[in-house]
Amino acid sequence: MPDIEGRIAALPIWSGPVTLAPLPGGISNLSFAATDQRGKFVVRVTRDFPFHHVFRDRELMSARAAHAAGFAPAVVHAEPGLMVSRFIDGRTLTVADVQASIPRIAEFLARFHRDMPAQLSGPGFIFWVFHVNRDYLRQLRDSGQPAAQLDRWLATNAELEAAQVPLPITVGHHDLLAGNLIDDGRRLWLIDYEYAGLGTAMFDLANLSSNNNFTPAQSRELLAAYFGHDPDEQLLRSHAAMEAASLLREALWSFVSVNHLDRPGVDYAAYGRENIVKLDAALAAWHERFGQ
C-alpha cells in the first residue's frame, strides 16, 4: 500500500505532529493508532469489499449512528479510503470475558437493538446470513470450486433458514467477536461496523455465542437474559440453527477471501477449514438434539 502512513500524517485534522503505530489484530483491514496533541485516535484504512457485501459508506453511516446512540466512539474524519475515530482507552474482551459476562452483554445488545434504528439514516442495508451464504456459494461455484460440496452446503443453508422463528427487524452489528467489545472500566463499547445493517436479533445472538464458544447452557442463559424469559424449544432450535449458519458464513467468508484478500500472516483457507470442523460439530449436535 503506497505510503499510507504519509497520507494519514498529512490529514488536516491533526493538532501538531502525529505519531502512528500499526494496530494488531484483524484479518481483513489495516488500522493505526494515531496520537497528536489532543489525544489518541484509530485510523481505519478502508476500501469496498463487494465480494463480502461491505461498502464503506454503509459502515460510516452505521458507525455514526452507533455513536449517536451511545455505543461507539465518535468518527472525527472520513474520506475515501480512511476513517478516523476516537480511541477507546480500555480492555479488549477475550472469549473468556464474554462467557463470564453474559447477562451484561445481553443487556447491552438489547439496548443496541432497541436504540439503533432511530439513529440510522440513509438507505437501508439488509444483512440476512442465508442470502450471504447463498451468494458466497455462488461466487465459489463461479471460481471453479467442486460442485458436490457446494451443493451440500447450499442444502444445509436452506435447512437452517427453515428453522428460523419470526422476529422484528432491527439494526444488528453482525460481527460479534470478543475483540470488537471494549470495557473501559465503566461501560462497554462496540467497534467495527462494516457488516452492520438491518436484520433480526437472532444473528447477533447466535454470532456472539458461536464466535465465543458458548455451551448450550450458556446459549440458554444468553437468550433468557436477552428476551427476559426462559426460551422455549422452538427459540432454542432457531438459535442453534443460526449458530450453525454463522459458522457456515465464517467458513465461506474465508474461502471467498482466498481469491481477494492478502493480509500478511493470514491463512484464509486454513481459517475456513477450522470453521467447517466447528460447523460439522454444531450440525451434528443440532440434529441430535432437535431432529432432522
Language model features with spans:
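Charged catalytic carboxylate motif
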Residues: 104, 108, 152, 204, ...
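Active-site activation/catalytic loop segments of kinase-like enzymes and analogous catalytic loops
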Residues: 202-231, 244-263, 278
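Start-of-helix signal in alpha-solenoid helical-repeat scaffolds, especially tetratricopeptide repeats
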Residues: 237, 241-244
